[in-house]
From Swiss-Prot:
GO MF, any single term: glucosamine-1-phosphate N-acetyltransferase activity
The enzyme's E.C. designation: 2.7.7.23, 2.3.1.157
Alphabetized PANTHER family for the sequence: BIFUNCTIONAL PROTEIN GLMU (PTHR43584:SF3), NUCLEOTIDYL TRANSFERASE (PTHR43584)
Family that this chain belongs to: In the N-terminal section; belongs to the N-acetylglucosamine-1-phosphate uridyltransferase family.
Gene for this chain: glmU
Keyword Metal-binding attributed: yes
Name of the featured protein: Bifunctional protein GlmU
Enzyme class: transferase
Source organism: Leifsonia xyli subsp. xyli (strain CTCB07)
Length: 486
C-alpha cells in the first residue's frame, strides 16, 4: 500500500572521481546490477508516494538506468550550485506543492541499506515527533566522519565534522550516516536559508540540521544495528568490499532457503538469480544475471552461468554458459561452452570440450565430446560422435544445419551448411555432408587411399621422420632376407 505521507529523494549527482573510471560510480555493477539499482529497489519497497532522483554528472546514462529500474521516479537535474543541500532543495521543489508528509533523503551509493532499516528510521521519526531524524552508525573507525553530539537527554545536539571536532568530540564513536528523514514543512523552510558561505562553496544538507536546532526544533539520531548497512562506495576498494559483503549475505540467504552451498567463499550469486530448494552449488560456481536453477540440479565445480535456465535434476560442471537453457536431468560438461541461443532438451548431453551457439538440441540427444554445433537443430535421441562440427559460416553469412531425430553421426563428420539430415539417418566416419541426407539413409564420402612411396625421403630428407623411415626400411629388408634364407 502506498505511503501517501512519504517522499524519497535519491542523491545521484556526485561525480565519483575516486573511482577513476569512465563509468559513473553509481553505474558500476554490484551483485549483477548497478550500484544505484540497489537503492532504487529499496525505494520501491518503501512504496512512497513520490520518488525523486537528482542527477548531474553523466546524467543521460544515469537517467536511462533509473528509468528502467524505477520508472515512476521523477528525475531532476542539479544546477551549477554544488552540494547535497542544493540537490535536496531542487528535489523538494519537484514535489507536489501541497505535499506535507515526510521526506527521506538517501544517497545513491549505499547499496547495502535495506528497506527494513529505513522503515525503522521512518517509524522512529514519526513516533518521536522531531523535525528531522538522522540515521547514525558506530563504525570500527570513525575518523573522517561527522560526529553525532547528543544532549544530556539523548537527543541530537549537533553534527560536528571531523576536521572541526575537538579531541573530546573525536572520541565519540557515533557518526552521521548521511541518511535523513525530515518533515516537509520544516525542510522547505530551512533549505531556503542555507548558503554556500563555507570553504567548499557548497550548500550542505547538514546545515539544515544546524538551522533546525537553532530554531528550537528537536532532531533525533537512530543508530543502525550494523555499520556496514550505511557504508558508501567511493573507490574500487570499497566496491570490492561491498561486493564481498553483499555476496556473503546472498549466499547465506539461499542456504537458509534450502540451497546447499559447499564452499561459500568461492561461490558468487548475483542478486537477481533464482534458486529452488535442494539445488547444490559446488566450489567455484558463479551464477550471474537472471540465472534460474530448478530443484535437484547440481552446478559446479568451476562453473559460470549468465542469464541461463537450468532444469530440475540437471548436472552442469566446469562449464561456461550465457543465455542458454538446460533441460531437466540434462548433463553438461566438463569443459563445455554454451553460447547464447543454446537450448538443450531434457535428458540431453553436452559433454567435454563441446561448443554450442544458437543451437536447439532435442531431448535425449548427445554431443558427448569435441563438437562445435552452431546455428543448428539436433533432433531428439540423436548422437553426434567425437569431432563432429557444423561449418556454418561461408565467410559472409551464417547458415543453419538441421539434423533430425534418432540420427547417428559418426566421428569427424562435417556438415557444410545449409544442409539437412533426415530422421534416422547415419553417416560414416569422416563424412563431409554437402547435400541433404534423406531419412534412413547412410551418407559417406569415400575416396581411394593413395600411398606415395618414398615421399618423406624425397621431400623431407635429413629429418627424424626420414631417418625413422630409413631404419624401418632396413629392418623390413633384413626380415625379408631372413625369411628367404639369404
Amino acid at each position: 500500500m502506498t505511503d501517501q505521507n512519504l517522499a524519497i529523494v535519491v542523491l545521484a549527482a556526485g561525480q565519483g572521481t575516486r573511482m577513476k573510471s569512465a563509468t559513473p560510480k553509481l553505474l558500476h555493477p554490484l551483485g549483477g546490477i548497478p550500484v544505484i539499482a540497489h537503492v532504487l529497489e529499496t525505494a520501491r519497497a518503501l512504496e512512497a508516494a513520490e520518488v525523486v532522483a537528482v542527477v548531474r554528472h553523466e546524467r543521460d546514462r544515469l537517467a536511462e538506468v533509473i528509468g528502467v529500474e524505477l520508472p515512476e521516479a521523477v528525475i531532476v537535474d542539479q544546477d551549477e550550485v554544488p552540494g547535497t543541500g542544493r540537490a535536496v532543495e531542487q528535489a523538494v521543489a519537484a514535489l507536489p506543492a501541497d505535499f506535507s508528509g515526510d521526506v527521506l533523503v538517501v544517497n545513491g551509493d549505499v547499496p547495502l541499506l535495506d528497506a527494513g532499516t529505513l522503515r525503522e528510521l521512518i517509524a522512529a521519526h514519526r513516533a518521536g515527533g522531531s523535525a528531522a531524524t538522522i540515521l547514525s552508525a558506530f563504525p570500527a573507525v570513525a575518523a573522517g566522519y561527522g560526529r553525532i553530539v547528543r544532549t544530556s537527554t539523548g537527543r541530537l545536539d549537533r553534527i560536528v565534522e571531523h576536521k572541526d571536532a575537538t579531541e573530546a568530540e573525536r572520541a565519540i564513536g557515533e557518526i552521521n550516516a548521511g541518511i535523513y528523514v525530515f518533515g516537509a514543512a520544516a525542510l522547505r523552510d530551512k533549505l531556503a536559508a542555507i548558503t554556500t558561505d563555507n570553504a567548499q562553496g557548497e550548500k550542505y544538507i547538514t546545515d539544515v540540521i544546524g538551522l533546525l536546532r537553532e530554531s528550537g526544533f528537536d532532531v533525533d539520531a537512530l543508530p543502525v544495528s550494523d555499520s556496514w548497512l550505511v557504508d558508501g562506495i567511493n573507490d574500487r576498494a570499497q566496491l570490492s568490499e561491498a561486493a564481498a559483503k553483499l555476496n556473503a549475505l546472498t549466499v547465506r540467504a539461499w542456504q537458509l532457503a534450502g540451497v546447499t552451498v559447499q564452499d561459500p567463499a568461492t561461490t558468487w550469486i548475483d542478486v537477481r538469480v533464482r534458486l529452488a530448494p535442494d539445488v547444490t552449488l559446488l566450489p567455484g560456481t558463479q551464477l550471474r544475471g537472471a540465472t534460474a536453477v530448478e530443484t535437484g540440479a547440481t552446478i559446479g565445480p568451476d562453473t559460470t552461468l549468465l542469464d541461463t535456465e537450468v532444469g530440475a535434476g540437471a548436472t552442469v560442471k566446469r562449464t561456461d554458459a550465457t543465455l542458454a537453457v538446460i533441460g531437466a536431468a540434462a548433463t553438461v560438461g566438463p569443459f563445455a561452452y554454451l553460447r547464447p541461443g543454446t537450448v538443450l532438451g531434457a535428458d540431453g548431453k553436452i559433454g567435454t570440450f563441446v561448443e554450442t551457439k544458437n543451437a536447439v538440441i532435442g531431448a535425449g540427444a548427445k554431443l558427448a565430446h569435441f563438437n562445435y554445433v552452431g546455428d543448428a537443430e539436433v533432433g531428439e535421441k540423436s548422437n553426434l560422435g567425437a569431432g563432429v562440427i557444423t561449418a556454418n559460416y561461408d565467410g559472409v553469412n551464417k547458415h543453419r544445419t538441421e539434423i533430425g531425430s534418432h540420427v547417428r553421426v559418426a566421428t569427424n563428420t562435417v556438415f557444410v551448411a545449409p544442409v539437412r539430415m533426415g530422421d534416422g539417418a547415419y553417416t560414416g566416419a569422416g563424412t563431409v555432408v554437402r547435400k541433404d541426407v534423406p531419412a534412413g539413409s547412410l551418407a559417406v564420402t569415400v575416396a581411394p587411399q593413395r600411398n606415395i612411396e618414398g615421399w618423406v625421403a624425397q621431400r623431407r630428407p635429413g629429418t627424424d621422420a626420414a631417418r625413422a623411415a630409413q631404419r624401418n626400411g632396413a629392418a623390413e629388408a633384413s626380415n625379408a632376407a631372413e625369411e628367404s634364407g639369404e
